[in-house]
Amino acid sequence: MNLVDEVAKGRDLQEQATDMPGPPADRPGEHPGGAGQGAARPAPAGQPAGAAEVPPAVAAAEAPRPPAKPGKLRELLYVTLPGCWGALIVGCLSFTPSLLPRDGIIQGLIWGITAAIGYGLGVLAAWIWRAFADRDARHPRRRSWTAFLIGAAVLVVVSFGLGQYWQYQIRKLMGVTGYNIAFVVVSPLIAALIFCLILLIGRGLRGLYRWVAQLLHRWIGQRAARAVAWIVVAGLVYLVNAGLLFHGFVNVANAAFSVRNTTTPAGVHQSTTSLRSGGPGSFIPWATLGRQGRSFIGTGPSADDIEKFTRHRAMEPIRAYAGLASATDAQSQAALAVQDLQREGGFQRKNLLVVTTTGSGWVDPALVDSFEYLSGGDAATVSIQYSYLPSWISYLVDQSKAREAGTALFDAVYGRWSQLPPGQRPRLFVAGESLGSFGGEAAFSGEYGLSLTAGTLFAGPPNFNTLFREFSDHRDPGSPEVQPVFQDGRIVRFADDPSTGVPPAGQPWQGSRILYMMHPSDPVVWWSPHLIFSEPGWISQRPGQDVLAGMFWIPFVTFWQVTADLPFSTGVPPGHGHTYSTEYVDGCNTVLRPPGFTSEDLASLRKIITRDG
């Protein structure tokens, strides 16, 4: 029996009770024992004298009845009409486009989360309205539920269809061909499961709150008990998430990726040249480099490869790297890497690149390969590992390690570099991608600190990067957030694709060049907790070239959409999302300023980098 039928049955019982006479003892004049007992009772206050007294049973039947309390199981599954309207509206808004294409599984996840948020907002709105209206909750009529079901059917179908159209447009914009219709079909089921799970968790927390409040009410007042209960439950939720669940997740991730760090990628072999760490004469054993360190050291273009591209005599590039197992802390790793770099002759090369890795210790091969090709092999690159966790986990746990590693490595290199005679110093460059740019920035206090180098290249900077945010927030009036202009581009500039130009066009860019590469569709660049409650400029202003013009900001919804984009930011073709492989050729060319390369040469190098990547 559904809830509407139960309410109708209750009304029938009320009508039957109205026709029943009261007990004989409740009728005036029928009490035995004399006139005193049989005399009519005084009329209640507000009731005219002589008016017939309403029997208690009838009065009870005619009085407004509160909604019947369901059983414990039904209470867990019980939903309110205002909450359902909120879930419907907010859930349907989740189909609006975000930065990247998403399959049915991710759409179902976002749908379920946002619907649960909408349900909570609907319940909260109804509670506030009742508080101002000074009325109790009432069961909705059958026709109200009927109207909701009809509206839900229409809205879900329309939203689902529009969502598929928008996803098609995004895939077309980025050149994504993969599409699994099965995932789309199961998305409503996933959404329902996520919604029910969140709803049950919320009901469980509500039950815990009530139990704590009742327990405390034995010793303190009701209002105080409720307030303390809220504090207790909120604190418990925080401790469980930040303590038990978070640390448990990190420990499991550490255990899993620490094992992976001991492996070596297929096709990578220990270097046989003394110009690489882990090779003959190196101070750093091959086994201590870690998986990504061995990949960085064991790959890259040879002198012959570079000569084929430049058609000039080339040098064998130098690479130095220290893994987590190479030393006990970041400072020791940096000192060891610089010692090995000096042994290899890195400070005698014309160009020296300091790279801060991503969370896993990864150095984008497109970055270093482009640097080595464009410098004719007269280059040395040094880096250290500070974690073996992927960047999306390192965002949560390794931000301080990234800053420490970036500062330690640059300080160690700069300390040795500054001891050389000015005429014998290599040109010093700094680079980093994603969390590596966050760590790379840590060694500098601002644009003038960065200008100590010959050039800087950061790709896909996270939104929380200190200097990136400073430059973007103080951009020149009229420049959009997706491509800001800072102080007329005197030192710092931003570009989506350097091959198409680095604004502002026509302005001088002398001395040190600091270039940030960022795609309008890169969720790493734009994700921020502020998306929950405030609209960012990159949405309110004109969109970038690979973002749909129909994207707009919705409280709560946009935050979860961009959050869901993060793990898949590298799963799109180059030139979009968090994939910068082909942009590194033109980025390095912009910062290095090597002579003699034509646009055809750069196009040829982009093909080489794409092939080798």
Outline where the language-model segments fall.
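C-terminal His-loop and adjacent cap/lid subdomain of alpha/beta-hydrolase
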Residues: 70-426, 446-613
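Conformational gate/switch positions in structured elements
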Residues: 2-5, 435, 523
